[in-house]
Amino acid sequence: MLNPSRYRILAIGKTRKAWIQNGLNLYIKRLPGLTITELKDSDLKKEAQSIRSSIKTNELLIILTEEGESLTSLGFANRLKSLGSSRLLFVIGSANGLDSEIKAMANWSISLSPLTFPHEIARLLLIEQLYRAKNICEGGSYHRN
């Protein structure tokens, strides 16, 4: 079973759109223990420094990037399940992406889609997929094949 209290989402910039924040709040309630931390957006080097200082020593760094691995929802759920009791830090960069240093540090890079989305929407897509993965692993009815 997936344990959302082992997951953190680190996002550069603020969620400004109320409808996105409402969606995030909905899934946060469904995933007790999951936290989303917003860091100030800046130039890539400063953002990288903020990200580095936010990584805990026992966390696996998972970045969302267009060059990342494409997965189905089932594949994502199975991958999370295979990581067992690891603590996971999901990082969503700013509109300028992520610094190459952060990309090199990543334990896993994933792509939500070959399409480009605003970074606020990427947060909502990620948290929905985390909820879906948890539901898949628990045999729930939220995900339909």
From Swiss-Prot:
Binding site for S-adenosyl-L-methionine: L64, G93, L112, S113, P114, L115, T116, F117
Catalytic activity field: pseudouridine(1915) in 23S rRNA + S-adenosyl-L-methionine = N(3)-methylpseudouridine(1915) in 23S rRNA + S-adenosyl-L-homocysteine + H(+)
EC numbers, comma separated: 2.1.1.177
Main subcellular location of this protein, as a coarse class: cytoplasm
Swiss-Prot/TrEMBL keywords: Cytoplasm, Methyltransferase, rRNA processing, S-adenosyl-L-methionine, Transferase
Listed GO MF terms: rRNA (pseudouridine-N3-)-methyltransferase activity
Similarity section: Belongs to the RNA methyltransferase RlmH family.
Function: Specifically methylates the pseudouridine at position 1915 (m3Psi1915) in 23S rRNA.
Protein name: Ribosomal RNA large subunit methyltransferase H
Species this protein is from: Prochlorococcus marinus (strain MIT 9211)
Gene from which this protein is expressed: rlmH
